[in-house]
């Protein structure tokens, strides 16, 4: 299972995985109520539209697909990428759909027409992560190489800021207080001031006993609804809970994040976990079938 999303408008959780399926789970009954068919290969990411009953999925078949959440109808196939679409994000304003691909490009899409309006080619390597800050009309993207985190202005896709995280960035998350988190394939983690692009803290994953040194990668991340707790999923079958103190508005300075909890997951999660935080609930998935 590669992706999770929890609806803010319905009691539904959506999951997507290497089996080319998207499943809709009723959180009140813990049962699958809908399945969405159409991808030709594994699905790597999914995102829910914040105001419409629309689901967007992306995967290894180099496409993103737009679904009617209720009827399971495939509305659009968003083609044009030349490689795996590794990340997707939806927002209320235009562009309502943003995709990042292994072909090192980002595409901004007109949701109503199902067509690409802008292709951003500033990244030199695969774009694996996207993040939408809740406090402003911009987005961030992450890849590998120098200046591998970029901040863009919507709707045009104008480049605003370059940030650097040494390593292959797998995940980005941003909270309403302007803290941007990035996690990389080598286990390194950084916190940035989103407005300025200045890093103010670095951390590193230490692999758990019984895991290989190569299993230090950070695969996914999500802030809780308060924006003060960050959950990360790692390749060594564990999750981090990181306390990111709120920024002081008067001094515009961030306090240092503090690791306050770590949990070792069951042994079947051999490839890492994905996390989504809703209130006090935590969902995580791995390379197993759950």
Protein language model regions, located:
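WD40-repeat beta-propellers
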Residues: 4, 22-25, 46, 64-68, ...
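WD40/WD-repeat beta-propeller blade N-cap
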Residues: 1, 37-43, 79-85, 121-127, ...
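Conserved strand-to-loop turn within each blade of WD40 beta-propeller repeats
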Residues: 9, 16-19, 27, 51, ...
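A structural motif specific to WD40 beta-propellers
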Residues: 31-34, 73-76, 115-118, 158-161, ...
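A conserved positional marker within WD40/Gbeta-like beta-propeller blades
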Residues: 12, 21, 32, 40, ...
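Short coil/turn segments that connect the beta-strands within blades of beta-propeller domains
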Residues: 9-11, 51-53, 93-95, 135-137, ...
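Eukaryotic tandem repeat interaction scaffolds
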Residues: 84-89, 93-185
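Terminal intrinsically disordered, low-complexity extensions flanking WD-repeat/beta-propeller proteins
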Residues: 166-168, 175-179, 187-188, 195-290
């Amino acid at each position: 299972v590669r992706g999770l999303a929890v609806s803010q408008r319905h009691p539904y959780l959506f999951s997507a995985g290497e089996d080319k399926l998207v499943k809709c789970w009723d959180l009140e009954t813990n049962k699958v109520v809908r399945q969405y068919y159409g991808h030709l290969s594994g699905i790597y990411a999914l995102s829910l539209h914040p105001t419409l009953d629309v689901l967007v999925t992306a995967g290894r078949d180099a496409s993103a697909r737009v679904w009617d959440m209720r009827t399971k109808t495939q509305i659009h196939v968003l083609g044009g990428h030349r490689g795996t679409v590794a990340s997707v994000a939806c927002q209320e304003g235009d562009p309502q759909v943003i995709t990042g691909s292994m072909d090192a490009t980002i595409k901004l899409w007109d949701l109503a027409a199902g067509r690409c309006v802008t292709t951003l080619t500033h990244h030199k390597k695969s774009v694996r992560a996207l993040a939408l800050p809740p406090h402003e009309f911009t987005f961030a993207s992450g890849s590998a190489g120098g200046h591998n985190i970029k901040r863009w202005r919507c709707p045009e896709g104008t480049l605003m800021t370059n940030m650097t995280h040494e390593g292959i960035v797998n995940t980005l998350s941003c909270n309403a207080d302007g803290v941007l988190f990035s996690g990389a394939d080598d286990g390194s983690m950084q916190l940035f001031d989103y407005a300025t692009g200045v890093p103010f803290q670095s951390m590193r994953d230490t692999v758990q006993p019984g895991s290989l040194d190569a299993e230090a990668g950070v695969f996914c991340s999500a802030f809780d609804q308060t924006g003060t707790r960050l959950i990360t999923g790692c390749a060594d079958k564990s999750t981090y809970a990181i306390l990111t103190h709120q920024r002081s508005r008067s001094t515009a300075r961030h306090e240092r994040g503090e690791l306050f909890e770590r949990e070792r997951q069951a042994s079947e999660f051999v490839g890492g976990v994905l996390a989504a935080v809703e209130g006090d609930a935590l969902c995580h998935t791995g390379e197993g079938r759950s």
